[in-house]
Amino acid sequence: VLMTNSDVVVMVDDGWKDLWSLRNENPLNDAETLRYGVKGQIIELGKKPNSLSDIDGQYTGLIKISHHKIKDFISFYDQLDRFILYEGREFKQMYMTTFLQLLIDAGWTIMPARVNHGWLEVDTVDDLKLYERLSEEGKLDVLWKVNE
């Protein structure tokens, strides 16, 4: 993420489907869209996908804002309407992907720092138990190498 040269960078896992397939019988049930434009920038994220072709990768939740853009980033956030719904959610419960899509729609360029695995998504206790079991069985290395 630090090595990607852009004012706004988010980490994207290109190998997301392996992880989602472990966590869900149908990966589309929990995955979100993420689409790249012709220059490699992210043009869409955070929507419900209709098919795997709607997903170029998965946003991992990690974001970098350059020091000279942070004031604009905060200002954009502060100027959002507090009284409307954002993707069906009140302002204070807005998803980060919704906020990022608003930035994209306003003309901001968001670039991906692309990885292939190297992180884990833990949304539930069941996710954690799954990873603990896979680690004990020596099968977690396919997604995340603990000793590197």
Describe the residue ranges of each PLM region:
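Conserved core of the sugar-phosphate nucleotidyltransferase
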Residues: 1-76, 80
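Conserved alpha/beta core of the MobA/IspD/sugar-nucleotide pyrophosphorylase nucleotidyltransferase superfamily
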Residues: 52-148
